[in-house]
Amino acid sequence: MSKKARRRARRPSAAAPTVPAYRVFVGHASTDKWIATVLCEKIESTGASTFRDDRDIKSGDDIPDGIRREIIRSRELVVLLSPDSVNRAWVQFEAGAFYGRRRNARIIAVLCHVEFDTIPDMIKSKKAISINQFDEYVKELAGRIRGTCR
């Protein structure tokens, strides 16, 4: 193989977009879409990619399959708990599926106008944060991505 051919083979293909290695699944109720969008923007500022079902599952796609696929791809779950979402079946499904994937999964419950005692049982053992502490989480996430924080 010529030198030129070897160089060309090493270059990433334009047809194959690169996906950041660190992906965060953001679970939320549809009524909290605006807040979830802001959380995704902050997460993406670290270099991570995000999944949000209302944005990333297309019309006609199978919703549970799409969620399961993204849960497998994601390293962390940020679940926005609000008065509208805390008892919603989809939020419970996402948290349960992520927790079931591996017991030591990093699940961050972000509380927005709800109390700590409203956190679903399956993720109560995980440290939750207030929406007002989200920037601190983003700093920790950036450290994990750079490999400087656990």
List the predicted regions and their residue ranges:
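Alpha-helix boundary/capping detector
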Residues: 69, 96-97, 124-125
